[in-house]
Amino acid sequence: FFYKKNLEEKYLKNWKDLQPKTVQLLNYFNQNVGQYPYKQYSVIQGGDGGMEYAMATLITGKRKFGSLFGVTAHEMAHTWFQFLLATNESLHPWMDEGFTSYISNKAENEILKEGKVNPHEGSYRGYRTIVERGYEESLATHSDRYDTNWAYGTASYSKGNLFLSQL
């Protein structure tokens, strides 16, 4: 873990609390997806939002714990659903982001003991809304060819997630 030690106390606490939860995340993914093949995984405060790399996550520092955990879970899951599975995130963003959303939602629900009957409920809501408003686009659309960011986000994160949840 690498984060600024001069963060406000509330954010510093969140980063400290994240450390044992990150171990739980790695164990969850190892048990439910496959073994992590590298010797270490790093969570680093930096960047804008969250960004995945094969052995690291960069994430902004000033976050509430739930947000910090959720982004860490999602970005860490990309180790399997992009890097190890070798999906082409430009050609098939729904596999990259959707599969990652699926497993990170399940991990978050279990590790944080959220008790949700359906941890993918937000994806169902988002998908339903875009369909009702007539903005849905095909999953076969290349990531930089969507008409709107909304259509890209819903297809990639929500619709890809729902694909797995329906299996």
Across the structure, where does each feature detected by a protein language model lie?
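Generic hydrophobic alpha-helical segments
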Residues: 68, 164-167
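Acidic/His/Gly-enriched intrinsically disordered linker/tail segments
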Residues: 91, 97-165
